[in-house]
Amino acid sequence: RASKLLGEDITKDEKIEKLKLIAKETVDIRGIGFYTLGKKRKSLNEQEKKRYAELFEEYFLKSFSSRLAEYTNPEIDVQSKEKLNENYTIVNSILKATNERPEIKIDWRIYTKNPENPLIRDLIIEGLSLARTQKEEFASVLNSNNDDIEALFKVLEEFSKN
């Protein structure tokens, strides 16, 4: 669906809004969010968890949709898939090269606990996990601010505003 959408002749802002809707249906935003928070999630109270989940969703949707909206007519070739266990399947794919960009290897980590509603949990692009990278960035913010969750909230809010 996203690939088809990116080929449509609509404005970048329209693409971004439609991509956000697709992401809400196909990506486990909450699961990724709490993974990226690392061990800090265990020390949050319910109110902080709720606030974090809301801020992370805004952050994720903006980051994801604005990056993808740059692509036009992406062609993705699924190479293989491997069921890791009851909960996860890895789908290996290639984003075909164009005049503007080289071929890119993308592995999709799919959460399949509910087979009726599989959700994307991570993208591994050229061997680099986006979720793990995000987790490291958030850990760095927390480490630089005496493990204060408010500092991370502020970073997420600032990103979403701009």
Each language-model region and where it sits:
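Short loop or secondary-structure boundary microenvironments that flank
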Residues: 9, 82, 124-127
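Surface-exposed, charged secondary-structure patches
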Residues: 62-104, 155, 159-162
